[in-house]
Amino acid sequence: EHKYASCANSIIGMPDETRDLIFDTINFVRKLPDNIDATGAFIFAPYHGTPLRDLAIKKGYIKDEEICSLSNTSESMLRMPTISKDELMGLAKVFSLYTKFPKERWPEIKIAEQSDDAGNSMMAKLGKEFDDTYRTTVSGADLHD
């Protein structure tokens, strides 16, 4: 038998994306097979030469002279009226929780989106529960053994 890990990564924070559209993505990921080992979200990066960067410039969400860095993917470069940078960072942080926990737990996860004491405390609690319940691979394990 072969050992492998499968991941379902998403990109959030594209031009004009809203919280509701991000939850469409979350609900799509929730329907994927149970044997997906990990889910996550990365925040959209407006790389030069891409049509979405051109759209973001046209809409005034980014200036043409702004350069997208590979080293800073934890926050959005876009300044959009549809969703704030802080909300995007919070959603990216808890994306995996939304995809795995039952919907009845979503009010707790919403608290964990925040970067204040209450949010950090809730994230620590839910993160431990997530690891204990949903992690199927051991970090650093050699998948080739």
Language model feature labels by segment:
Residues 1-50, 94-110:
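Conserved C-terminal portion of the radical SAM core fold
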